[in-house]
Amino acid sequence: MLLTIDVGNTHTVLGLFDGEEIVEHWRISTDARRTADELAVLLQGLMGMHPLLGMELGDGIEGIAICATVPSVLHELREVTRRYYGDVPAVLVEPGVKTGVPILMDNPKEVGADRIINAVAAVELYGGPAIVVDFGTATTFDAVSPRGEYTGGVIAPGIEISVEALGVKGAQLRKIELARPRSVIGKNTVEAMQSGIVYGFAGQVDGVVARMKKELAADPDDVTVIATGGLAPMVLGESSVIDEHEPWLTLIGLRLVYERNVSRA
C-alpha cells in the first residue's frame, strides 16, 4: 500500500491507498517540535491499528509520498523514511519532482507544495480550467488553465485564524465554536460572530472565484470549482460557486505524483 502524508501548518493528514482507493485516513496536529523518532512512534501507532498492516513499522507499506508546508517537519519525515522504512520508495514533493503540471509563476519554487499537488489532482480528476479552494490555516484559491497549467492564485486568512483574531483583538469578544448560526442575523454575540465567519467566508469565496473566472476562461461557466480542506464543510452549503467537494484532493495528488516519479517493475 501507499502511505501519503500532507503536512499543513495546523494539521497533518495521512492516507493509505490500495491502488487508487483510499482505504484509511487519519488527521493529527502538526507539531514542528517532533523529532524523527517521535514521528516514527506516532506512525507505528497509527499503522498498527490497521488490519491490513503489520505491527512493525513499514510492514505492508510499498511506497511513501509526502508534501509539507513546514520545512522542519519535512526534514524529520525525510529522516523517518531513511531510518525506519529502509528500501521503501519515497517521494518528497520539492523542487525537481515531476508533477506533470507546468507552473507559470514568477518564482515557482516559492509556491506551496500542497497547492501544486492540489492542482495535479484537479487536472487529473476534472481537467482545466479549474479553481481549487482549500480551506486550511489559510484559505487558498489556485487556478488551473484550460491547458492544465498552474497559473497562480489567491491567499486569504483562514477561518480559524479569523476566529482567533476576533477573540484576541476584540475586547468584548471571545473565541467561539465553529458552527452554523440559526440565522444570518445573530440574536446574541456568539451567533453574530458565527454568522460573520460562515457567511462572510461564503461571500469571500463567491466574490474571489467570480473574479478569478473572468481572468481564467473566456466562458466562466467552463471553470470547475473544487473545494477541499478540513474546514470546507463550514462553507459548502452557503457558497453558490462550488461545483465539487473532494476532501482527499491533496492525498490523491500525492498518489499521482508518486506514480509519476517511481517507475514500476
UniProtKB/Swiss-Prot annotation:
Pfam families: Pan_kinase. Its EC number is 2.7.1.33. InterPro entries: ATPase_NBD, Type_III_PanK. The active site is at residue 114. Pathway: Cofactor biosynthesis; coenzyme A biosynthesis; CoA from (R)-pantothenate: step 1/5. It is found in: Cytoplasm. One of its GO terms (cellular component) is cytoplasm. Its cofactor is NH4(+); K(+). K(+) binds at residue 134. Transmembrane segments: none annotated. Substrate binds at residues 112-115, 189. GO terms for biological process: coenzyme A biosynthetic process. A monovalent cation. Ammonium or potassium. GO terms for molecular function: ATP binding; metal ion binding; pantothenate kinase activity. Catalyzes the phosphorylation of pantothenate (Pan), the first step in CoA biosynthesis. NCBIfam families: baf, PRK13318.1-3, PRK13321.1. This is Type III pantothenate kinase. It comes from Streptomyces griseus subsp. griseus (strain JCM 4626 / CBS 651.72 / NBRC 13350 / KCC S-0626 / ISP 5235).
